[in-house]
Amino acid sequence: AAKNSFDAQLTAFELISEAALELVLKNIPDSQRPTAISPWYVLAEFSHVGAAPIENWLATRIECGEVADGVIAQSAAQAKQLWALRENISEAQKVEGVSIKHDVAVPVSRIPEFLARADAALLNAFPGIRVVAFGHVGDGNLHYNLSQPDAQKNTAFIASQPEVNRIVHDTVHALNGSISAEHGIG
């Protein structure tokens, strides 16, 4: 809906999971939750668009139930704070221990299906695994990182990497996607 409404004026469209945001809030000092708790958040950036069209677009999305809540940065400083939440995800994840990281791409329309299928398969195979998903969904790219279950040691989690990778890669390929998407490999 954002791309249809704003076309080239939509310069960023980042998906952030609650798990990713929680890591930032927990591990990065001075981070603040920008809005009510939700399973997913989108950080969108617009160029050369006044506030009114964005406010109207957001109000329409909320009215029709596509969006639960929203925040529009009122200053450059507030925009910087919002972007810091996205930019600090990887750093926040490091504090929690070892991660198994993936950079995948699937057709934009299939991102929800990828998340549902991969999450379910991984949680079935590795109860307690923590999925930290975020990324540039405007072009189908997604950082799909897995953190160890809270009680598991790094070495045990690292040993599961081949099976974790197989599950993620099989799901990506089943949806006509690719791995190492952002970096041009695969």
Regions found by a protein language model. Name each.
Residues 1-186:
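Noncatalytic alpha-helical scaffold of FAD-dependent oxidoreductases
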